[in-house]
Curated annotation (Swiss-Prot):
Domain notes: Contains two DNA recognition domains, each specifying recognition of one of the two defined components of the target sequence.
Name of the molecule in the record: Type I restriction enzyme EcoEI specificity subunit
CDD domains given in the database record: RMtype1_S_EcoEI-TRD1-CR1_like, RMtype1_S_EcoKI-TRD2-CR2_like
Gene3D superfamilies reported for this sequence: DNA methylase specificity domains
GO biological process, one term: DNA restriction-modification system
Entry-linked InterPro entries: Restrct_endonuc_typeI_TRD, Restrct_endonuc_typeI_TRD_sf, Type-I_RE_S_subunit
Family: Belongs to the type-I restriction system S methylase family.
Length: 594
């Protein structure tokens, strides 16, 4: 099958096989990987090095003739003292050959055609040379690299040496698996040094096609075999030199190498175009979804909202076809909920103003009984803090008006592993608090040498808010609906409890994560850098909240749960369809190779 036909006949599979990577943090949608196009690139590369990308030409000089010339050149270089004489190389056995080669091809090793890990000779410490650390080495198929300029005296010791025309391969995980490999070009003075995590091959003959050799050490089969040969501990595994210099490489006639590289480059350009079209299409789709969903939250009244919803529901199957679009729908539902637009209002419901009066009376009584501390009165929510008009029966208030005592915990030095059971105390990590989700397993074991502080134990009904950490992890909130015993909050988590059972803790937790209250918390974050931000208890107490009647709170939560069930079913079907597309892309790849 011609590769162009392989691409065009199955364009729908290559472009629709998507994979979502989950990413933690408030408001983060999973990043989409174009899995099908990635598999297509790998397939083209694998076909290239197996002799299946371009047709063979019987008039091409066989690879064996070029290898003879390289061997003669090597002998001459040894005579001239330019390279050291090698021990006789072992022939590649039949068992070592991973697949059958076309006529005119030969199996070689890099040690046959190159000097491995050579040195450079520079005598002047003041001479400027290129310096190439690992971040300057790309994963691109063209072997591109960036460079810095250093003086030889600064870097002559403790680094890997290389020169223009050398081919280098990253040997450490995960750089090797990510195919970091390079052809050095344009080095200052023709020479350079860089990261010690490289194997370097200096080709013996100018007849060698460096780009073709590079394709081999980036091919999926080569990377897979290299990964299986790695040695060392986790996180520090490396591909040994013996693999780099001795693993069999398929070697075609020189003219075919040039045809392979040319065709490969053209097909990569096609893949680039396909990738760009897919990304543009995904972006356009997401923008369309967000624009249409914005019409719901921007609706001025119930009639306009109904019209806009009817317009969207006509195209439901077309609009909500990605995980990001379904997540956007969920966020819109939450936004409508806290604006009072999700459910119809009942004029017979007791207004929230009466609820707030009872809460205030209950608070006064608790202060008298010494169960909570008296707090300074909070100012009314100003008009500037009210971004929209509330439905009849709703009231603006502040978090501090409806809660009992607020506190934060403590952060003793703990063992990293979680507490195994309820007999052993643990301290919650901030990752226990996710948006609208409590994860009790995210804790650290309190050492036996430290006494627990039961006053910080988390209880059912507590609302938790992350107080300190990276910007995207501060102000994240959840309700503890149910928890095991003997888990304490850390000093990076604020905890509070509502005064009255007539206020839904689920609804308040929702407000903390979406809408006016969440926006206020976002604006209240402070810190010298985004990597370490804070929210104070005072700011949290002052956060405005749109409080509906009790009956509406319960109705809102019930409606959200119903909507979310539908969204989760949509997402489950989508994930199942995506998995099928991934399997199709894999099957197509296997069929083309075999």
């Amino acid at each position: 099958m011609a590769v162009e036909k392989l691409i065009t006949d199955h364009i729908d599979i290559w472009s629709s096989a998507l994979q979502t990577r989950s990413m933690a943090g408030r408001g983060s949608n999973g990043k989409i990987d174009l899995y099908g196009i990635k598999k297509l690139r790998e397939l083209i590369l694998e076909l290239a090095v197996r002799g299946k990308l371009v047709p063979q030409d019987p008039n091409d000089e066989p690879a064996s003739e070029l290898l003879k010339r390289i061997a003669a050149e090597k002998t001459e270089l040894v005579k001239q003292g330019k390279i050291k004489k090698q021990k006789p190389l072992l022939r590649i056995s039949e068992d070592e050959k991973p697949f059958e080669l076309p006529e005119g091809w030969e199996w070689i090793t890099l040690s046959e055609i190159a000097t491995i890990n050579p040195k450079i000779e520079v005598t002047d410490d003041e001479q400027e040379i290129s310096f190439v650390p690992m971040p300057c080495i790309s994963t691109r198929f063209d072997g591109a690299h960036d460079q810095e300029i250093k003086k030889w005296g600064e870097v002559k010791k403790g680094y890997t040496h290389f020169a223009d025309g050398d081919i280098a391969l990253a040997k450490i995980t995960p750089c090797f698996e990510n195919s970091k490999a390079v052809i050095f070009k344009g080095l200052k003075g023709g020479v350079g040094v860089g990261t010690t995590e490289l194997h370097v091959a200096r080709p013996i003959s100018s007849e060698l096609n460096l780009q073709y050799i590079l394709l081999n050490i980036k091919s999926p089969h080569y990377l897979s075999m290299g990964e299986s040969m790695m040695t060392g501990s986790a996180g520090q595994k490396r591909v040994p030199r013996s693999f780099f210099e001795n693993y069999p490489i398929p070697f075609p006639p020189n003219t075919e190498q040039a045809r392979i590289v040319g065709t490969f480059s053209k097909l990569m350009f096609l893949c680039d175009q396909l990738e760009q079209q897919s990304l543009t299409s995904l972006d356009a789709h997401q923008q369309l979804v967000e624009t249409l969903l914005a019409t719901l939250t921007d609706s001025q009244n119930a009639e306009e909202l109904a019209e806009n919803w009817a317009r969207i529901s006509q195209y439901f199957d077309t609009l909500f076809t990605t995980e990001a679009s379904i997540d956007a729908l969920k966020q819109t539902i939450l936004q409508l909920a806290v604006m009072g637009k999700l459910v119809s209002q009942d004029p017979n419901d007791e207004p929230a103003s009466e609820l707030l009066k009872r809460v205030e009376q209950e608070k006064v009584q608790l202060v008298k009984e010494g169960k909570i501390k008296k707090q300074k009165p909070l100012p009314p929510v100003s008009d500037d803090e009210k971004p929209f008009e509330l439905p009849i029966g709703w009231e603006w208030c502040r978090i501090g008006e409806i809660i009992a005592n607020m506190d934060a915990g403590w952060s003793p030095a703990c063992s990293p592993e979680p507490s195994p059971n309820e007999d052993i105390w643990g301290v919650l990590k901030t990752t226990a608090v996710q948006s609208l989700e409590y994860r009790e397993q995210e804790n650290k074991t309190l050492p036996n040498s430290k006494l627990p502080r039961p006053q910080y134990e988390v209880h059912d009904g507590d609302i938790l808010v992350t107080r300190a950490g990276p910007k995207n992890r501060v102000g994240v909130s959840c309700l503890v609906e149910k928890t095991r015993s003997k888990l304490m909050i850390s000093d990076k988590i604020i905890r509070f409890h509502l005064i009255s059972d007539d206020i839904s803790a689920k609804y308040i937790s929702l407000c903390l994560n979406r809408g006016v209250t969440a926006d206020y918390l976002e604006a209240s974050k402070s810190g010298m850098a985004e990597s370490q931000m804070n929210i104070s208890q005072e700011n949290l107490r002052s956060a405005p909240i749109a409080l509906p009647p009790t009956a509406i709170q319960l109705k809102v939560i019930s409606t959200i749960e119903d909507f979310f069930k539908v969204c989760d079913q949509l997402k489950s079907r989508l994930q199942s369809a995506q998995q099928t597309q991934l399997h199709l892309a894999d099957a197509l790849t296997d069929a083309a190779l075999n």
